[in-house]
């Protein structure tokens, strides 16, 4: 969690009441400043990006004699970040840092480091952090601004780099909160090094670093993998006795999950009942953790009950929430209830998100109900839904399973278009099933075009080339092009 400090704004950087004025001006254009000045701010937030650089727009506002507040700048940068326009947000941060009238806070430094990593990569992020460490002016904030770099290592599972950074931070005396230790525990769990999680906890105890709720939850998960249920229960008892933390629904869910994985279903059910009593009536998050765990227990009554109660929480129910409850109902085998919930979602959705319909589509295909799947797919298209790679993957599996290969081939061609814009790739089994169909039907032209497409996408394999070579040999055709593709693929 990035540590926030109050930044000091000086001279013309007025910080009073600007946020409300900015929101008003961006919403209805009622700001009292000049149209040109107002437009310079709106230009930054243009959906397709500003026509001019962010720095020139900000400088124009300053040069025209108008005040720019830190609150104003932060509000704009947050909106840019929310829409994943990290490069524009970084331009703003760089401009702010170069202004003599702004004193950067810990929050600003950490945010800039995070944006550098997101925009330019880890190498530049590392260089910026090193610059902070060797700057006497910024050394005081570097102590709290290292987390984005550590989190980037964790996200990319860069164990050695994360360990080296932790060693450096320890030598500088920076490790005084549980946050970096929690990040290391996440990294070790993600890389399957559960014993090291326990070592991190021992290090925290040795250095008198307090554990927080996340520390205990990660520790319990690791103990389950290393030592079993008894060790997890010991950690949980220690947590209950730790007056600095409050045991909430998240820790009880962690404990329940351990019991489920270890086959102690009744213990898990009792823990989940206690967790239900601790749910926050102003936030849905906990409800869906419990819904998922009830589904793992095969308890469809628990899934439905929590789902209905979650509706009383204020705020719009998101597509992610619907995906969670639909997946849980499908997992418990209650397709009828899943269809009812899906109809409920369809009746209120503004934008048709195919990730929701894909849950039901996958259930139909797995149950061998291909006609239902096709009917649902048709309805999705009518409602304006745009199939994604997962939609086509599900349908291809269904069509291959019921030997409707022409439809599977059409779907694969749709997938070829999508693969130019995403990292997903179809399974080897589906790829080979279509190739084997071409061989069986002696469709050598289609097979050759198919393999060429796969070759361009880097998906051609030795079994695929062997199949095509067999077809060419059988048809007594030259295979120079095939050998050339194999050579390029180093096969």
Swiss-Prot record:
Give all cystine bridges in this chain.
none
Q: Which keywords label this protein? A: Repeat
Q: Which InterPro entries match?
A: Pentatricopeptide_rpt, TPR-like_helical_dom_sf
Q: GO molecular-function annotation terms? A: mRNA binding
Q: Which Gene3D superfamilies match?
A: Tetratricopeptide repeat domain
Which residue intervals correspond to the PPR repeats?
69-99, 105-139, 142-176, 177-211, 212-246, 248-278, 283-313, 318-348, 353-387, 388-426
**Which PANTHER family has this protein been placed in?**
OS02G0796400 PROTEIN, OS12G0527900 PROTEIN
Family recorded in the similarity comment: Belongs to the PPR family. P subfamily.
- Name of the protein: Pentatricopeptide repeat-containing protein At5g27460
Q: What is the lineage of its organism?
A: Eukaryota, Viridiplantae, Streptophyta, Embryophyta, Tracheophyta
């Amino acid at each position: 969690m990035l540590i926030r400090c109050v930044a000091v704004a000086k001279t013309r950087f007025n910080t009073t009441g600007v946020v409300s004025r900015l929101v008003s001006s961006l919403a209805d254009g009622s700001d009292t400043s000049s149209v040109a000045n107002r437009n310079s701010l709106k230009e930054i937030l243009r959906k397709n990006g500003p026509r001019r650089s962010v720095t020139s727009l900000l400088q124009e506002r300053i040069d025209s004699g108008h005040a720019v507040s830190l609150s104003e700048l932060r509000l704009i940068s947050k909106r840019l970040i929310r829409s994943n326009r990290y490069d524009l947000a970084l331009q703003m941060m760089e401009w702010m840092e170069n202004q003599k009238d702004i004193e950067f806070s810990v929050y600003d430094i950490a945010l800039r480091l995070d944006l550098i990593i997101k925009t330019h990569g880890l190498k530049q992020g590392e260089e910026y952090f090193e610059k902070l460490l060797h700057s006497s002016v910024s050394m005081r904030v570097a102590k709290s601004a290292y987390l984005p770099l550590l989190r980037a290592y964790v996200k990319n599972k860069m164990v050695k780099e994360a360990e080296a950074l932790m060693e450096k931070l320890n030598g500088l005396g920076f490790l005084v909160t549980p946050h970096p230790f929690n990040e290391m525990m996440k990294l070790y769990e993600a890389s399957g090094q559960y014993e090291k999680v326990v070592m991190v906890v021992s290090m925290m105890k040795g250095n008198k670093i307090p554990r927080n709720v996340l520390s205990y939850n990660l520790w319990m998960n690791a103990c389950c993998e290393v030592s079993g249920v008894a060790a997890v229960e010991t950690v949980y008892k220690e947590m209950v006795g730790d007056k600095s933390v409050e045991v909430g629904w998240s820790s009880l869910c962690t404990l329940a999950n351990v019991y489920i994985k270890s086959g102690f279903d009744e213990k898990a059910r009792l823990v989940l009942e206690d967790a239900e009593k601790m749910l926050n009536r102003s936030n849905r998050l906990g409800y869906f953790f419990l819904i998922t765990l009830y589904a793992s227990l095969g308890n469809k009554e628990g899934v439905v009950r929590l789902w209905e109660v979650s509706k009383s929480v204020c705020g719009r129910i998101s597509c992610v929430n619907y995906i969670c409850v639909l997946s849980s109902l499908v997992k418990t085998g209650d397709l009828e209830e899943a269809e009812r919930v899906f109809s409920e979602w369809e009746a209120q959705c503004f934008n048709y998100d195919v990730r929701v319909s894909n849950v039901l589509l996958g259930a139909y295909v797995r149950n061998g109900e291909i006609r239902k799947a096709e009917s649902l797919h048709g309805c999705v298209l009518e409602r304006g839904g745009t199939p994604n790679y997962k939609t086509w993957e599900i349908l291809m599996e269904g069509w291959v399973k019921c030997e409707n290969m022409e439809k599977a081939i059409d779907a694969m061609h749709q997938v070829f278009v999508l693969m130019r814009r995403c990292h997903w790739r179809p399974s080897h089994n589906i790829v080979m099933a279509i190739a084997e169909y071409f061989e069986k039907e002696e469709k050598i032209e289609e097979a050759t075009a198919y393999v060429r497409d796969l070759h361009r996408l880097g998906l051609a394999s030795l079994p695929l080339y062997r199949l095509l070579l067999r077809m060419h040999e059988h048809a007594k055709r030259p295979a120079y092009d095939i050998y050339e593709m194999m050579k390029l693929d180093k096969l």
